[in-house]
Amino acid sequence: MKHHNYTGLSDAEVLESRQKYGANILTEPERIPLWKRFLEKFFDPLIVILLVAGILSIGISCYEFLVLHEGSTVFFEPVGIFIAILLATGIAFLFEVKADREFAILNQVNDEEPVMVIRDSRTQQIPKCEVVVGDIVLVATGDEIAADGLLLEAVSLNMDESTLTGEPVCYKSVDKKEFDADATYPTNHVLRGTKVMEGHGICQVLAVGDATENGKVYKAAQIDDTVKTPLNEQLDRLGKLITQFSYAIAFLIIIGRVLMFFLHHDFDWIHFISYILQTVMIAVTLIVVAVPEGLPMAVTLSLAYSMRRMLKTNNLVRKLHACETMGATTVICTDKTGTLTQNQMQVSDVFFFQEDESCRQLIYENIAVNSTAVLDVSDQTKPHVLGNPTEGALLIWLHTQHIDYDTFRTQTMVVEELPFSTERKMMATVVTHGDNHVLYVKGAPEIVFERCVNDDLQATETLQHQLTIYQEQAMRTLGFAYKVLSPEEVCIVDGQLVVDDLTFLSIVAISDPVRPDVPLAVKECLDAGIKVKIVTGDTPGTAREIGRQIGLWTESDDERHIITGAAFAALSDEEVRERVMDLKIIARARPMDKKRLVEALQSLGQVVAVTGDGTNDAPALKVAHVGLSMGDGTSVAKEASDITIIDNSFSSIGRAVMWGRSLYRNIQRFILFQLTVNVAACLVVLFGAFMGTEIPLTVTQMLWVNLIMDTFAAMALASLPPSSAVMRDKPRDRRAFIINRQMAWNIITVGGLFSLILIALFYYYAHAGWSLYEQSLYFTIFVMLQFWNMFNARAFATGESALKVKGCRGFLFIVEIIFIGQILIVSFGGEMFNVTSLQLVHWIYIISGTSFVLWIGEGIRWVKKRQ
């Protein structure tokens, strides 16, 4: 492969190309119009029944108005029913649209992926969407191709074209002798959306956006919220259970009301039809109230809120299930570099095996040509690395030595390359050097040293001693070696280095400090019952020292808690299962070691989250319950992951666990509140049906209760901010039912207490004279009991006061809407809601009297906190 100097496009040429060929953005497919989506809400079977009942109610009201000459007030209730239906469906629709917009962010992020291009003779990074036709693009292992292009250079370039052709491995070349005449696309073409599995290259963009092959078959990558997560499945089962219960109650109400009619009324067809219609409407309304249609909305809102806020804490959720699963995580398998450390590589020391100038020049050239990274030196005082951080650190070291790495690259010509891989743990490059070919090798010192002429025992001891010193300081090390090749000598065969008589040049020690926030984040995870395991390519000594610095490795730990990748691979499956829970560190790990570790932990019932940033991490990311890719990781790793940690930091992973646990807790709070109201509403209406008096709650009143219980409660409780208190709990059992024992006891006791109070009040009012005023009192008492209970639901499992609402602006806003809404309905609802205005003194009695719900809850929480 020849070495080329590319100029690339100028700024003016970029603008001209974009105007001529368009931007590198795919046009989204046409969406369903909002009005159609809104109308779909009215095709719900229960809403249809309610609409039919409402229409029949209007018919009867017309008969009463036109034939019986009753006043226009007969229309208030049916009109109220329709307003309540519109309000409930409308609010649900608005929040569904809002949630969709929250999720749409994931589809935009892909257009912001950084791409390395050459423009104005300078290598720079630009967002994928800014790539234009004619751009010179550099591609490397793990990259996703930004636009269709013609290869100008290619080194061991293997592409995954499965997204277009189904071919997982497709060899690419610029050598016409290697062209495949039967290939679906030309061998020297790379295509948008395909991924570099191995090697690197340079291409010139031929087509962007919709003009690419990918664009021609594009369907917008929408979030698939039809996929049922374990939480969704649990909620579906719960919803069906409640629905069946509510149907049974509704059936009993119809039976009871019909019996009461024949026992207490003279038969009259018009009266009977009106009575039956009212009965059916009450029964259907009770079903509407009882059926938890707010559950899906609570989950959607909670996910949308969590995903948006998690993005602010550097967690980009790519797949829905990941939010809830992070909350159940029991083990986190993490990389070291960039996740536990700052990924700010700098050369701390260079140990030369030979101290002459020729040796130094060989090392300089080795570093310069054996690298795919480049430096952006537009700011001479602070060069910016484009590419691999480790290789960048070496180039910056050359820069500080006043050595221009580009001079070595232009003076030599690369003849052959063997790219770095985690399996071989080294890379090799053959270049022309004067009249000779020189092989330069860079990689793990012990692996490179094995291929060197090392007859000198003292040299071996010196190497081991120096490596130990560096490892005890948690430095990562690289070894450098070379060989001048004879004219006919072959050193790379079938992707393997076949030379073992190299000359060792030096060890370079690179420091990468631990992130300041990581020790505390690791402690939080350990306190939360989550095991942390480091899986790294570094030596055992380096990994152990990093483990000590972050608080994972303690003085009591021994060799049972650490293992090398080779030793781990040699264990039988049974031995792995016996030892895997004790392991804290796997050093010199390879990608398949990480995958095997994850599978072994899963076989023991653990919920595993795993980090990865490279292409070879994809298998482990896919098999884990939650795959966590790094923000600067490869596109292949991100594609396989569920969450992208934008800042790469372990502390962000800890925050993702907190969000996952809080999300689950918020949904539990919503269920707790809703089922408590369900129990009270069903028992009160059922009791009223068999008393032969007026029904305690009218249809419009129950629809207002439904609006509070479903829509408003979902908005208030599903979007509560996360609490660090959840990190003091142990991980929940992922298979456990969402209603735990404490919740069930709370629902039964509180719901039962409310029912007793409301039935006693109803019995008293019914026998004392059930007037419109008494109905208004009763309706307000019912709502205010639920109002105060919402505060208790918010405080559920926090151990804190329900009045501690700092930071809960959404909750307070909804509480205000419910309170003001109840006052307005009672004051101005009139015959539409079957209410009349209440005296101020009665408002004071009701508000203070029903608040006992809150004070009893506060007392119980106070006692529990003191225990």
Identify the function of each model-found stretch.
Residues 1-731, 738-739, 752, 763-764, ...:
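Conserved cytosolic headpiece of P-type ATPases
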Residues 709, 754-755, 776-791:
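Generic alpha-helical transmembrane segments
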Residues 732-753, 770-777:
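Membrane-water interface at loop-to-transmembrane-helix junctions
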Residues 762-770:
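Long hydrophobic segments that form regular secondary structure
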